[in-house]
C-alpha cells in the first residue's frame, strides 16, 4: 500500500477528538466511500480498518494537545519512561488482541506522532507483534535519545534486523 494511503487513514482517526466517536464514525465512513478500506472498529486511541482483500490496518492515534493523558504520555516517552505509561501498555494490548484473530502477516500497523511512538514501542517490546505483523509505517514519531535507549534495551541483533525490515519511519514537513 502506498504511504499516502496510510497517512490519510491515520489522519482520519483524529475526527474522534474533534467530533466524538459517533459523529467521527460517520465522517470516517463517508471519507472511506470509494476506497478499498472500511472502518471496523473505532476507539479514541486505536482504529481498525479492513481492506477489501481481508487484511487489516491498525492505526494508533497521536497526541490530542487538549488531552492530559496524551501530554503525560509524551512527557514519559521523552524521559524514556514509556514502560510506565498506561496508554502505551493499553494500546499495545489492543494491538495484540486484534492480532489474535488475524492471519500472520496480514496486519499493518500505522501511527502518527505519539501513535507512531506507541507503534514503534509495540514493535520493539513485543516479539509476538514484531514477528506477526506484515509491516508498520509511522509518521513524525515522537522520539528522544532516552526513548531510544528504552526501546533498544533487551533487543537482540536479529530483533533489530527485523525491526529495520518491517518498520518504516516517515518525516513530513509542516506537521
Predicted features by range, described:
Residues 111-115, 119:
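Gly/Ala-rich beta-loop-alpha elbow adjacent to hydrolase catalytic centers
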Amino acid at each position: 500500500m502506498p504511504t499516502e494511503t496510510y497517512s490519510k487513514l491515520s489522519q482520519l482517526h483524529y475526527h474522534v477528538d474533534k467530533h466524538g466517536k459517533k459523529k467521527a464514525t460517520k465522517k470516517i465512513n463517508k471519507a472511506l466511500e470509494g476506497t478499498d478500506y472500511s472502518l471496523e472498529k473505532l476507539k479514541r486511541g486505536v482504529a481498525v480498518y479492513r481492506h477489501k482483500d481481508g487484511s487489516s490496518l491498525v492505526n494508533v492515534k497521536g497526541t490530542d494537545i487538549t488531552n492530559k493523558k496524551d501530554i503525560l504520555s509524551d512527557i514519559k516517552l521523552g524521559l524514556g519512561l514509556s514502560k510506565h505509561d498506561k496508554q502505551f501498555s493499553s494500546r499495545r494490548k489492543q494491538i495484540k488482541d486484534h492480532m489474535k484473530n488475524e492471519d500472520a502477516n496480514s496486519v499493518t500497523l500505522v501511527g502518527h506522532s505519539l501513535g507512531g511512538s506507541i507503534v514503534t514501542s509495540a514493535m520493539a517490546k513485543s516479539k509476538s507483534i514484531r514477528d506477526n505483523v506484515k509491516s508498520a509505517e509511522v509518521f513524525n514519531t515522537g522520539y528522544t535519545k532516552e526513548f531510544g535507549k528504552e526501546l533498544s534495551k533487551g533487543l537482540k541483533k536479529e530483533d533489530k534486523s527485523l525491526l529495520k525490515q518491517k518498520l518504516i519511519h516517515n518525516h513530513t514537513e509542516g506537521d
